[in-house]
């Protein structure tokens, strides 16, 4: 049984509004980046290849191709470093973890769009 105090603290930290997204979706994550004394927002757009739902410990992994090189970044869902998230495109996939996309390139790595 989880302690009521821990549950209350976790509920307090999970107040951020998160859009519903799933593996296969293309999302844009606005990340707060601090360079020296000034802060700015950096957009990271890519396909969600994994999602982990564990309350305040939830995380998701986004993959994009930058200059012909695959770049993956794992974000903590309720991190204060994330300013905002937006779903650009819904993907139609049948798996929860899309790690097989790491081995594919070009047209083979495309994901069908979900028709709804």
Curated annotation (Swiss-Prot):
Source organism, top-level taxon: Bacteria
Signal sequence range: none
Species this protein is from: Pseudomonas syringae pv. tomato (strain ATCC BAA-871 / DC3000)
Annotated GO MF terms: structural constituent of ribosome
Gene name for this UniProt entry: rplS
GO cellular component: cytosolic large ribosomal subunit
Family: Belongs to the bacterial ribosomal protein bL19 family.
Keyword Cell inner membrane: no
Name by which UniProt lists this protein: Large ribosomal subunit protein bL19
